[in-house]
Amino acid sequence: MSEKKINLLDLDRKAMRALFADMGEKPFRADQLMKWLYHFGVSDFEEMTNINKVLRQKLAARCEIVAPEISSFQKSTDGTIKFAINVGQGQEVETVYIPEDDRATLCVSSQVGCALECTFCSTGQQGFNRNLTVSEIVGQIWRVSHFLGFAKDTGERPITNVVMMGMGEPLLNLANVIPAMDIMLDDFGFSLSKRRVTLSTSGVVPALDKLGDAIDVALAVSIHAPNDELRDILVPINKKYQLDEFLAGIRRYIAKSNANRGRVTVEYVMLDHINDSTDQAHELAKLMKDTPCKINLIPFNPYPGSPYGRSSNSRIDRFSKVLMEYGFTVIVRKTRGDDIDAACGQLAGDIRDRTKRLAKKRMQENQISVTMN
């Protein structure tokens, strides 16, 4: 049986150089190859003209360049594009491109599904399947860059920012997320600024400490409630890592980080008459007073079967004003792509359909059982 080929999109620069050393090649050859991959989007070794023919043949015999494919895409009226990315085994994840006047952000998934079961999030309600590999994470950027056109073709960078805010909890997939972000930041990779790569977490505190020791990127933290009692319901991982512990971990990360410029972004979804009262705004302000942050209020994006409603503009405005009275910088996130279910909390991919099929199957089995009894 032939040996499985190495997918070069799985390798950060350290691993790529180790592979080339194993082949008896100098480190700069690995750097050249990475540049072909990520600056020019080349996947055919024969097109890598500054790499000699013998090495190209060695690479072709031992390695491959395989990224997940785009299955389909939908374009919103506001220009947002939601991509369904086929990661094999009949599974898909969703990746969202958000163009703005001064930037173009790609929202990337880290897992097929999510295990955290946040009650306001469509992805969290669909269950967890598996972690994505490095090539499946960076491959989302690579494929969308091909779709939009690399800088060599268009004259401008197609993606300026990456946010790890798609499907999944990134800190539960650190083994693949860290090398993937290394490739995003690497000068021979996607060459993004560390301030333009953001990881969002719901609070896996031990993994947050490991992240801070391994890499420096911007951090967004999903708080969503001003106290443990409510957060236990909205974000069930809070039962394991409560707010005091999470906030202490955030402060440790800030102390290690330059990317965050001394503060993180707090994400707070606005749920009608659940977490959006002025009393809760005062409570949130007091909770966050010792943690340097700006606060991003996110109008809830309903999904089929969701138990919550979106806060009214007037309630969001009152909540925001209370926080500003305490001196916080407050941003109300503009909802993008909600007409194609691409907004925050709406991503579910193929898992939604699979969950529906499983639920239908269980219901049918129960009906059969009742009939037999």
Curated annotation (Swiss-Prot):
TM regions (residue ranges): none
Binding site residues for [4Fe-4S] cluster: C114, C118, C121
Gene Ontology BP terms: rRNA base methylation; tRNA methylation
Intracellular or extracellular location(s): Cytoplasm
First-tier enzyme category under EC: transferase
Listed Gene3D superfamilies: 1.10.150.530, Aldolase class I
Domain of life according to the entry: Bacteria
Cofactor binding description: Binds 1 [4Fe-4S] cluster. The cluster is coordinated with 3 cysteines and an exchangeable S-adenosyl-L-methionine.
MF annotations from Gene Ontology: 4 iron, 4 sulfur cluster binding; metal ion binding; rRNA (adenine(2503)-C2-)-methyltransferase activity; rRNA binding; tRNA (adenine(37)-C2)-methyltransferase activity; tRNA binding
EC number: 2.1.1.192
Record's miscellaneous remark: Reaction proceeds by a ping-pong mechanism involving intermediate methylation of a conserved cysteine residue.
Descriptive protein name: Dual-specificity RNA methyltransferase RlmN
Upper lineage: Bacteria, Pseudomonadati, Pseudomonadota, Gammaproteobacteria, Alteromonadales
Gene: rlmN
